[in-house]
Amino acid sequence: ARPRVGGAVSAALLLAYAGLKVGDQISLFSFAAKPIGMTPAYMHTQDFPALQRAASRIDYAPVESNFTLALSTLGAELNRRSLIILFTEFTDATSADLMIRAAGRLVKKHRLLFVVIKDEELEDEERRRPESGSDVTRANVAAAMLRDRQLVIARLQRLGADVIEVPADAMGAHVVEAYLGIKRQGSL
């Protein structure tokens, strides 16, 4: 999970720079079991080093993310309609359900884009040709987990959230493209 956090932070910084270049207000918010930090809203590219410093403090935490607390805290901090971009993975059905409920409250006022990091190991496991009984079991478990993941994505989309699934090694380009697409729609 640690390399994925680093990839998400790098993608968030690329996105922040793109947002500053087009004149948007940009803030970083991070959380794990509780909110960790939120930067002020920055508007100019010369403010980018402040965002980099804040991002350098974001690290992997071996705890369950508390989406309910984090998203309600974030919602309370934002006083105008905003585009909220969440980099996430789905680890289990319970945390995914809590995330969906918290997102449901936010999506009423804000535009949400979920950047879901693909689990390529899980996809490989599902596609691997089984050579033993345990291989069949692993493939079936992987297939079930991938189905659950698609159900979570569908629920988020039904709420009105945008969702993109991206490979861990190409998050930046995909998220900037999605952000610019939302900007072109003019729906903020």
Residue ranges of model-derived segments:
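Exposed, interaction-prone extracellular/peripheral surfaces
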Residues: 1-188
